[in-house]
């Protein structure tokens, strides 16, 4: 009986992922560019962000290997975290020239598996989007990965554990982790664009204020919506995948995640 229930849950999750992938790939509108588009950054800055992001990606591979070897049954949940990020970050609204606003979807995976594992999942999502959907690019993958797959997940991880420590309210912690990680992603993107293209008058500060101000118009409501959606997904996981959450020590009053920093 238990095997049949587990098989049914796995089948429904796989079907959900396949349907989401099909809808995004086959029915997506023409792209306006995902994050920073291919060729937009000067070569020096593109190389710089690649060098900054690579160590996190390598550490993330080691973290993922450790997680899957220790608990192979978590592979399906890892795939779900990646699919959640892929679907949410593919929902785009045009914003500043050379970029766009969208949810990031990295908060859930960061809470479940830690920021290092999420750095790999997020980078793979960005790679697939660049190759399959023409969102973002390969030269700018380092910059996009640093903002969405590294800075955002680390923020989500720390915010979640700090909120749990201060309030003990898990759903509030998850909402804040997802929302603020989304906002930080776009603060970092604004910094990256301002560094590459300082304003003739006012330099970096003026350029950052321009990029961040325009992003905020669409990103603040998107971030709040992402936080609410992440809480709904968390409730679903508690109902249908309690064994995995217990294995990760994320329910029954324990706030430690599978990966420690």
Swiss-Prot record:
What is its pathway?
Cofactor biosynthesis; adenosylcobalamin biosynthesis
- The signal peptide stretch is 1-33
Q: Where in the cell is it found?
A: Cell inner membrane
**Primary location class:** membrane
Instruction: Spell out the molecular function terms from Gene Ontology.
Output: cobalt ion transmembrane transporter activity
Which UniProt keyword terms apply here? Cell inner membrane, Cell membrane, Cobalamin biosynthesis, Cobalt, Cobalt transport, Ion transport, Membrane, Signal, Transmembrane, Transmembrane helix, Transport
GO cellular component terms, A-Z: ATP-binding cassette (ABC) transporter complex
User: What Gene3D superfamilies does the database record attribute to this sequence?
Assistant: 1.10.1760.20
Domain of life here? Bacteria
Gene Ontology BP annotations: cobalamin biosynthetic process
Q: How does it sit in the membrane?
A: Multi-pass membrane protein
Membrane spanning stretches: 41-61, 76-96, 108-128, 140-160, 172-192, 197-217, 220-240
**Subunit comment for this entry?**
Forms an energy-coupling factor (ECF) transporter complex composed of an ATP-binding protein (A component, CbiO), a transmembrane protein (T component, CbiQ) and 2 possible substrate-capture proteins (S components, CbiM and CbiN) of unknown stoichimetry.
**Role noted for this protein:** Part of the energy-coupling factor (ECF) transporter complex CbiMNOQ involved in cobalt import.
The record's family statement is: Belongs to the CbiM family.
The protein's name in its UniProt record: Cobalt transport protein CbiM
The opening ranks of the lineage are: Bacteria, Bacillati, Cyanobacteriota, Cyanophyceae, Nostocales
Gene behind this chain? cbiM
